Amino acid sequence: MDLDSKMKKMGLGHEQGFGAPCLKCKEKCEGFELHFWRKICRNCKCGQEEHDVLLSNEEDRKVGRLFEDTKYTTLIAKLKTDGIPMYKRNVMILTNPVAAKKNVSINTVTYEWAPPVQNQALARQYMQMLPKEKQPVAGSEGAQYRKKQLAKQLPAHDQDPSKCHELSPKEVKEMEQFVKKYKSEALGVGDVKLPYEMGGPSPDKLYIPAGDRSTPAALGPMESKPAECKGTQYFCYCCKLSMKEGDPAIYAERAGYDKLWHPACFVCSTCSELLVDMIYFWKNGKLFCGRHYCDSEKPRCAGCDELIFSNEYTQAENQNWHLKHFCCFDCDNILAGEIYVMVNDKPVCKPCYVKNHAVVCQGCHNAIDPEVQRVTYNDFSWHASTQCFLCSCCSKCLIGQKFMPVEGMVFCSVECKKMMS
């Protein structure tokens, strides 16, 4: 596909998931409606991953594209209709007989993803070692967790220029080079195996029983003498605790096969979340999810959530922004040279702050301007003025004085409090 075609293809898919209910805001959200350049809902300001959007095909396309032109092409299949690579996600279905009073019924459990191993018992064991709330059983909290992490850890706009907003041809080329580089240097998929299946351990992983410490240990290929593995103890690279004999471990090829992880320890070193579908990025001796690997390589715009490939961008409040995206979170007006207030780490212009976020003075019942001094006690605020911060009984100014708060009122003395009770 030539560059012009790629530029024409760019779009954010605003119809996708339209009207889907928000799982976080419930009835407060009118339904998902994608903001025209932010990756959030225009109605409730939550991300698409917080909404009940059916994205299984889209997510499989996204992961399929990630694995395209890598050594992991065995995990994808190209559709005959459009040639788009699709992720061949391994689904595991377990059937358990359940004894009833009259007959035996079958209880079926479907895992929306499972490690692609031939030994289903090993895959089942792997699942049981994950926290219950993170096991991707269809229709469960764990399936919702996986869906959310796919969106969070592997943003489509971190690998596909057509999912980004108004990139220049130069930025498209730079992004394509960046994606090609991380595919060849950092991207990987974990392997689930029993520790002894990977060959001889390194000397620092060898465990010598207390009574035999003077006996030299012989290292050799474990495949040829599997019985020798009983004298070996393996340790998790993350938690440093030992692996129990017979338990599955995760290996990461880019890290080297002398390192292994408990299934629940195979997490991103930045966000500490399980690496979704064991997809990892390896850098400087650490595991990263896709999002946080990219964050370690490129600045990310706090407005549109995309990586910044332009040489010119702005920094404010310890965050990075495209020049055109340093805008009010409420009204989208550009904030360059304007007064703004940070609300939940989002910049808001002064008019929107006064209208939507400002606290109300208990004295005059007007919004308190962000630049004006105020007095705050618990959940109550007052203008720090002789007209507002007054005794609720005798109207004595209380600035710099002791006071008695009672349910939004303040008193200068016990006597005044008694008079109002």
UniProtKB/Swiss-Prot annotation:
One of its GO terms (molecular function) is zinc ion binding. Residues 234-297, 299-359, 362-421 form the LIM zinc-binding domain. Residues 155-164 have a biased composition (Basic and acidic residues). The keyword Zinc applies. Signal peptide: none annotated. Its main location: cytoplasm. Pfam families: LIM, PET. Residues 92-199 form the PET domain. GO terms for cellular component: cytoplasm; focal adhesion. Residues 133-164 are annotated as: Disordered. Keywords: Cell junction, Cytoplasm, LIM domain, Metal-binding, Repeat, Zinc. SUPFAM superfamilies: Glucocorticoid receptor-like (DNA-binding domain). One of its GO terms (biological process) is negative regulation of cell population proliferation. It is found in: Cytoplasm; Cell junction, Focal adhesion. Belongs to the prickle / espinas / testin family. Interacts via LIM domain 1 with ZYX. Interacts (via LIM domain 3) with ENAH and VASP. Interacts with ALKBH4, talin, actin, alpha-actinin, GRIP1 and PXN. Interacts (via LIM domain 2) with ACTL7A (via N-terminus). Heterodimer with ACTL7A; the heterodimer interacts with ENAH to form a heterotrimer. Scaffold protein that may play a role in cell adhesion, cell spreading and in the reorganization of the actin cytoskeleton. Plays a role in the regulation of cell proliferation. May act as a tumor suppressor. The N-terminal and the C-terminal halves of the protein can associate with each other, thereby hindering interactions with ZYX. This is Testin. It comes from Oryctolagus cuniculus (Rabbit). The gene is TES.
